[in-house]
């Protein structure tokens, strides 16, 4: 079985390290990049005294402030626990099948999905069938199996998203595993009542040519109705109870921070008026609450580290952030004018326990 971890990505915020406190240098660097400047502009105090922020500029700034509280950047958290869901195989055509999984109440409340694994049982190819296809080279005796998530929209139209794809040999048999974590993440974003999880499995030839033209048709997967349920498609859901392994929310301001403090969000005020580089340049805001993630995270059992060898230790990170709208002064053609900019991922909204290597979920498109 090929490892499933190759498609997992490391999620990194523009902070020095996950959950680390935002510094003035990082804020300055983000602002320079947003304005495509190499250095802080030189502005005279006399120019600033005559500068008036127009109503439409301030309205744009306020609108960005309001929007930033609803449009957040999200990260992925780690988890553990195991559930198995049996699915139905509905044949669409010779090489394409639709898997249907009833998912309601399959994911425990207050839990985080770590990984979803689709297991399909590849049936042995009869020797007579292999003989009819003649002598197949190792390359021509392979087929590509692709798994897509199928979404049925309210208007009845369908949309598919590629989830996983791999090559299988027609000479092999047994269980094949596919990482379908992203499909379950998409399903979780659907509005209620949620439809079943629909996975479309396609078997296609890898190469063109007479030897490979029909080899992919030899790849068959066991369907519902197999003797005693053996070999029917399975969906494994690995989750972690956030009550034991998650963060606690905001830190208790009355409690002292210790090495054993559970991961939490701590207030941290960034005073822009006290930063020399912001003088005469940053008009709004005078400062802001950035927050930082502090504390430690409970580590999963050692057995889990064996299953996911490429995941590092769990740590307290910023899993949801907001942008920071600002009004800055820009000098063009001898005139100074105000301009609204928005710096992404500047304010921590939520802290979570996560592990390096966890999947970054994509947003579900309309």
Curated annotation (Swiss-Prot):
UniProt-listed GO biological process terms: anterior/posterior axis specification; determination of left/right symmetry; heart morphogenesis; negative regulation of transcription by RNA polymerase II; transforming growth factor beta receptor signaling pathway
Main location: secreted
UniProt family annotation: Belongs to the TGF-beta family.
Organism: Homo sapiens
Signal peptide: 1-21
Disulfide bonds: 251-264, 263-316, 293-351, 297-353
Annotated glycan sites: 158
Organism domain of life: Eukaryota
Cellular component GO terms held in the UniProt record: extracellular space
PTM remark: The processing of the protein may also occur at the second R-X-X-R site located at AA 132-135. Processing appears to be regulated in a cell-type specific manner.
UniProt function note: Required for left-right axis determination as a regulator of LEFTY2 and NODAL.
GO molecular function, one term: cytokine activity
Protein name: Left-right determination factor 1
Keywords: Cytokine, Developmental protein, Disulfide bond, Glycoprotein, Growth factor, Secreted, Signal
């Amino acid at each position: 079985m090929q490892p499933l971890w190759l498609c997992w990505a490391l999620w990194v915020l523009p902070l020095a390290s996950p959950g680390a406190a935002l510094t003035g240098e990082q804020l300055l660097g983000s602002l320079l990049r947003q304005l495509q400047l190499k250095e802080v502009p030189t502005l005279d105090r006399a120019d600033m005294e005559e500068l008036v922020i127009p109503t439409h500029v301030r309205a744009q700034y306020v609108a960005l402030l309001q929007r930033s509280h609803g449009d957040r950047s999200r990260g992925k958290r780690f988890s553990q626990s195991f559930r198995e869901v049996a699915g139905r195989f509905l044949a669409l055509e010779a090489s394409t099948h639709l898997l249907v999984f009833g998912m309601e109440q399959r994911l425990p409340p207050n839990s985080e999905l770590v990984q979803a694994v689709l297991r399909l049982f590849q049936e042995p190819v009869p020797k007579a069938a292999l003989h009819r296809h003649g002598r197949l080279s190792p390359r021509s005796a392979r087929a590509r199996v692709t798994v897509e998530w199928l979404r049925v929209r309210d208007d009845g139209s369908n949309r598919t998203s590629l989830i996983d794809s791999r090559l299988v040999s027609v000479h092999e048999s047994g269980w094949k595993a596919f990482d379908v974590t992203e499909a379950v993440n998409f399903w979780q974003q659907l509005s209620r009542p949620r439809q079943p999880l629909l996975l479309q499995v396609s078997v296609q030839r890898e190469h063109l040519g007479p030897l490979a033209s029909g080899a992919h048709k030899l790849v068959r997967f066991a369907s519902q109705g197999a003797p005693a349920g053996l070999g029917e498609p399975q969906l494994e859901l690995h989750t972690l109870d956030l009550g034991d392994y998650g963060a606690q929310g905001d830190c208790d301001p009355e409690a002292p921070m210790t090495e054993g403090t559970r991961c939490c969000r701590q207030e941290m005020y960034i005073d822009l008026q006290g930063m020399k580089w912001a003088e005469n340049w940053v008009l709004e805001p005078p400062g802001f609450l950035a927050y930082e993630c502090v504390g430690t995270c409970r580590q999963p059992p050692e057995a889990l580290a064996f299953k996911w060898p490429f995941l590092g230790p769990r740590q307290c990170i910023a899993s949801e952030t907001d942008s920071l709208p600002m009004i800055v002064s820009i000098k063009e053609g001898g005139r100074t004018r105000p301009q609204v900019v928005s710096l992404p991922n500047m304010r921590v909204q939520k802290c979570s326990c996560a592990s390096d290597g966890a999947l970054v979920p994509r947003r579900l498109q309309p």
